[in-house]
Amino acid sequence: MSLYLNASILVALFVIDPSSSRAEAFLSAHPEIVVVSDFGVAEFSSAVGRRVRTGDLTREDGQLAFCNFDNGSHDLHTGRRSRLPISTQQLGFLRRLDINLRTADAIHIAISRRLGAALVTFDRSMAAGARALGVAVATP
């Protein structure tokens, strides 16, 4: 089964973060194909930008995170990664009134479901929603 990474994992992989070692250890232990969606890249970019604007990261560190992501300085880039364009065609479960889903979470879950991939996230709420919808979840 492939692994679909959401932004919480991407940030931990490319920015020094309290979760970085867990994310790196998880990927090292799982040789599966890694999928990153364009939506995940957008969320990653937004999160890095927010950290720069709030002073949690220097501008240089933010630019380095983008450069490293784009140029492949992580195991994520050893041919295991696949990029996926955004598709929101399978978001009907947003109308389920029994599951609390944020829009961004629903998009990540829909992409994972479409791929038949395990959703890899640190976000407990997203993980719970995915499980409720029958999507496999891996939490490092």
Predicted segments with their positions:
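Acidic catalytic patch
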Residues: 41, 65-97, 105
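Acidic, PIN/NYN-like endoribonuclease modules and their adjacent C-terminal/linker elements
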Residues: 2, 37, 88, 109-140
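Hydrophobic/basic alpha-helical segments enriched in Actinobacteria
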Residues: 3, 21, 59-61, 78, ...
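Short, flexible loop segments at the rims of nucleotide/cofactor-binding pockets, characterized by
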Residues: 11-13, 96-99
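Short beta-strand scaffold positions
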Residues: 5, 36, 81, 103-106, ...
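Short glycine/serine- and small hydrophobic-enriched flexible loop segments
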Residues: 46-53, 114
